[in-house]
Each structure stands twice: as structure tokens, then as C-alpha cells.
């Protein structure tokens, strides 16, 4: 599968290969008050090197969407994701790899609980891109968050009600990242 995102400039594209998967039966008719969940298994590779594994249960016809899935990606090269980092941080990615282990669960009442474990290995940003919509101090943040081996280990839990009109993932993720940077900045002082 050739994935392309034409909403970002420059455009982003990714090659998904060796895809294998199955999705069990599901129904729009709720049984015993809960939507019938289908078993989901999807494996493959992204960009030829990153292993992809998604497993769990879901019902795409339920309102709100009902799911309980876990997904893992290992060793995804980050430089091809530079269009996103330029848009949101003002810097391209020179090198680095991402591994992640995430879990998302949405209950019938719309309550979302998510775990996001991200490991960034040897992440290096380039210079600020002139004219980029944003410019964040990503080199400083990377230096503060990385351990002595150049590994950044992030744990970003998320929860909230999808039925709440004020609920949005963007501010929650932004707040979690700001808290991580704040902890990284104060961490050297805890050693004194």
C-alpha cells in the first residue's frame, strides 16, 4: 500500500508492505448492551524496515467507536517524517528511529483510555527552517530528554470522554510533552 498525505507540504508518503491481517465478524446491533467486537490482527512493514503489529478488538459501526487495541512499531526511520516536524516544530529530522507500543480502549460510554510508550533513538533535528509555521527549541528539548546513550523514553497516558465536546487530544498531548520537558529541565537539579 502506498500511503500519501497531500495535506502537508512537502507531501509525505510511506510504503506499507508485507501486510497480513484479519478482521472478525461484527454487527451494528448491540447484544446485551454492548457492541459486538471483532477480533483484529494486522502485521506488516513500514518503509521496508519498521515492523508493524496491531492486535485487539473493535467495532467500527458502534457509536462511539468501540475498540480495545494494542499496536507496536519497531525501528521506524524518522527523517522521512520531516514534513511533520517542520510544520509543528520548525526543524527537519536529520536522523533517528522510533519504536512505540500503544494501547487504546474506548468503552461503550465513550470513555477513552490510552497508553503511549515511545522510544526515540539517536534523534537529531536539523537547523530551523526559514518560513516554517512554528519554531520550537527542539535541539534543547532533545538534549534534555535523551539519556547518555541518546535514547528518549516517553510515556504519554491519555484519558477522557469522547462525549465531552471540550475533549481534544491535541491539548492533552501538548500538556504531557510540556510536563516532560519541565521534568527534564529540573532533573539535573535533583542530583545536587
Question: Could you tell me what each predicted segment is?
Answer:
Residues 2-164, 170-192:
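Small-residue helix/turn framework positions
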Amino acid at each position: 500500500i502506498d500511503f500519501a498525505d497531500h495535506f502537508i507540504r512537502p507531501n509525505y508518503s510511506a510504503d506499507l508492505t508485507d501486510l497480513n491481517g484479519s478482521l472478525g465478524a461484527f454487527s451494528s446491533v448491540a447484544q446485551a448492551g454492548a457492541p459486538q467486537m471483532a477480533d483484529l490482527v494486522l502485521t506488516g512493514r513500514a518503509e521496508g524496515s519498521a515492523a508493524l503489529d496491531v492486535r485487539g478488538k473493535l467495532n467500527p459501526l458502534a457509536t462511539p467507536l468501540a475498540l480495545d487495541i494494542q499496536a507496536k512499531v519497531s525501528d521506524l526511520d524518522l527523517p522521512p517524517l520531516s514534513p511533520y516536524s517542520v510544520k509543528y516544530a520548525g526543524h527537519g529530522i536529520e536522523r533517528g528511529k522510533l519504536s512505540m507500543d500503544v494501547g487504546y480502549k474506548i468503552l461503550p460510554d465513550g470513555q477513552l483510555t490510552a497508553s503511549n510508550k515511545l522510544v526515540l533513538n539517536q534523534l537529531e533535528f536539523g537547523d530551523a527552517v526559514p518560513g516554517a509555521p512554528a519554531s520550537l527549541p527542539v535541539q534543547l528539548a532533545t538534549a534534555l530528554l535523551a539519556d547518555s546513550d541518546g535514547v528518549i523514553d516517553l510515556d504519554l497516558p491519555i484519558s477522557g470522554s469522547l462525549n465531552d465536546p471540550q475533549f481534544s487530544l491535541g491539548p492533552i498531548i501538548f500538556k504531557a510533552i510540556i510536563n516532560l520537558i519541565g521534568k527534564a529541565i529540573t532533573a539535573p537539579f535533583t542530583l545536587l
